[in-house]
Amino acid sequence: MSTNPNPWSPYDSYNDCSQGICNIYCPQWCYLIFPPPPPSFFLDDDSSSSSSSFSPLLIALIGILTSALILVSYYTLISKYCHRHHQTSSSETLNLNHNGEGFFSSTQRISTNGDGLNESMIKSITVYKYKSGDGFVDGSDCSVCLSEFEENESLRLLPKCNHAFHLPCIDTWLKSHSNCPLCRAFVTGVNNPTASVGQNVSVVVANQSNSAHQTGSVSEINLNLAGYESQTGDFDSVVVIEDLEIGSRNSDARSELQLPEERRETKDEDSLPIRRSVSLNSGVVVSIADVLREIEDEEGESGGVGTSQRREEGEDGDGKTIPPTEANQRSGGVSGFFVRSLSTGRFIFSRYDRGRNYRLPL
């Protein structure tokens, strides 16, 4: 039996692949042995835990909760600030109501433009001390601030509708409005309209002559009420002034030149009483006594020198001289009353004086 001298020699020299020996000639019998893979259960736990802790659903939930928390915090801060501001404003309003003065001091008395009233007219409206049992005021609360009236509290009482309001509330309203905030009635009747408006209402009457040929002269009336009409609303004020002193003084001279029918009509005109027509919501009243006093003062100062001399001489509107008789027929015996409507700004005359020649100031 033959033996291999070197049993541990490699089998590289063998070319027979049927023996199942791995060599370079028989690579199909060669196997690569890979190292065993690491245990997989540790990696699965880590990956599952990381994926579960950062899932998109959890991220979305966290974002929603954070946004809701921010919105709630913002709303809380805004509500607290607004509530504090409202309490401060309410306390200041109550303090001003107790003091009875209002928001406007003497340094804030300015005139307002538009439809509102000026400060002097607002201050002239009646101030009333509230008493709960007298029943003089309709209601027990202010319609502007919706707060209850307190006993002996100063309220401003509107003249036409008798609605009462707190001083600061109604003063602020009347700065930009001329009517009642509750019933929309115009605030027209005040206690002292001529002083509150602050306009110079001057009545200038022409000097009257003592001549027997003069039958009357035109009373020139200058009413400086341009600003009054725009500030106090629609005032249907009618002022009627009738000068009967001149008519009574010259009625005899005129009666000699007229026919019996004209004398009868003239007698009816001369017997008319002194009238003063003022609408109910008027703010301006010109007294007849004041007009007569102005006539006497003007006569005493200038001694009858003025527009009456031109009327006495019979001077026409075009500069021509006409006879006294014709001048008497034009002017008439009784100087007619003069009507001026503040709401329309037009000048109208009575039915007795439509045909007379008047010279109105420009």
Swiss-Prot record:
EC number: 2.3.2.27
GO molecular function annotation: transferase activity; zinc ion binding
Superkingdom of source: Eukaryota
Reactions accelerated catalytically: S-ubiquitinyl-[E2 ubiquitin-conjugating enzyme]-L-cysteine + [acceptor protein]-L-lysine = [E2 ubiquitin-conjugating enzyme]-L-cysteine + N(6)-ubiquitinyl-[acceptor protein]-L-lysine
GO biological process, any: protein ubiquitination
Alphabetical keyword list: Membrane, Metal-binding, Transferase, Transmembrane, Transmembrane helix, Ubl conjugation pathway, Zinc, Zinc-finger
Tissues showing expression: Expressed in flowers.
Pathway assigned to this chain's UniProt record: Protein modification; protein ubiquitination
Family per record: Belongs to the RING-type zinc finger family. ATL subfamily.
Protein's name according to its UniProt entry: RING-H2 finger protein ATL52
RING-type zinc-finger residues: 142-184
Membrane spanning stretches: 58-78
Start-end of Basic and acidic residues biased regions: 309-319
Lineage summary: Eukaryota, Viridiplantae, Streptophyta, Embryophyta, Tracheophyta
Region (Disordered): 252-271, 296-333
PROSITE patterns, alphabetized: ZF_RING_2
